[in-house]
Amino acid sequence: MSYASRIGLMFVFVGAGIGATAIALEAQNDAPNPYRTVPGVWAALPDGRDWGSTSLVEVSPDGETIWAVDRCGTNDCIGRVENGSGQYDDLDVVFQFNKQGRILNQFGAGMFAWPHGIDVDDDGNVWVVDARGNEELMRGHQVIKFSPDGEVLLRLGTAGVAGRTRTTLDQPNDVLVTPEGDIFVADGHPGNGNNRIVKYSSDGRY
């Protein structure tokens, strides 16, 4: 899908949440499907860990690797482990796989509340959207730019703080970086949220 098409879809999705009435549509499942599922478990996580909710995957610009974000084996990265001993801080959430599903890189432990959208720019940098927030832990309501090795290069929004200003976001859900470096963030997940598209320069200026 072209960048222009993806930007257009971001506007459509955000606009649909503004005062729209939900209309139930019956799924159309009779179209031909030329694809087949891969047998077994493709892209297994380390230590036998189960996949949690995964909202989006992204193929690198060179088509050689696949990036995916996992919500800490469940649907939330802020919660208690089964024995009540603490947070899910020790679980990475960002994974890079080769075509065969083998992990090449992983990072992001203790950095996210509810990872949602992801984009890989033309330089191979990985942009991850953290939709929900926790002000006490200073997580969420932001977009984080990583190098391919997991170094934090840029943050958009104020960690853990929801808002509708030039420096804050409220439950952003997706990000897109154009070949020219412009950054578009779809800000707003619930119907009563910000429901806006925010544009930044390549260095994060509003």
Predicted regions mapped to residue ranges:
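N-terminal secretory signal peptides that target proteins for export/translocation
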Residues: 1-5
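Eukaryotic scaffold repeat domains enriched in small/polar residues
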Residues: 21-206
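Bacterial N-terminal signal peptides
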Residues: 8-20
